[in-house]
């Protein structure tokens, strides 16, 4: 019995988190239909008790009281306008590849309801920014940040691309050694 109660409460929480927001609340009937569709038995009293248990546990579930109560997730880790700004930044960044941009937008979409996630995906797809193909940039940035934190030197070589898209070392292949102190993001570039 305890296991089925736990599963029901967890599925209720997942449903509220993924499917509801202030513009898309769920009624008790919606919740019961969802739970029954997942093979979890629920009645009105258990939904009321489970939502109250989640609220008592500190989960911000907003209850709109009426003849047919409606429920939705209140505060989330990020508010929708914050997610929109982050999505715009990822989608329009010329340092983040198209593939990585899509992955990051998908991760951001998991932080809100499916309704708002669909809007985020639409906004992200509107970006017409030219994106790089270099997937190594994330690891290079991470390595530099690690070197900064650990107060270690880095070494690198400059290169450029030919019209045939081949990498050619610049400055005779000179190996630069530096002590990095900070990385700064400015004008869509790291410095």
Question: Can you describe what each PLM-predicted range is?
Answer:
Residues 79-165:
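Bulky hydrophobic/aromatic content
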Residues 33-35, 43-46, 125-129, 163-166, ...:
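N-terminal start-of-chain detector that recognizes signal peptides
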Residues 145-191:
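Loop-centered beta-sheet repeat module
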Residues 1-27, 45, 108-134, 188-189:
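Short N-terminal signal/transit or membrane-insertion segments
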Residues 1-89, 171:
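Short, basic/aromatic recognition patches that contact phosphate-bearing ligands
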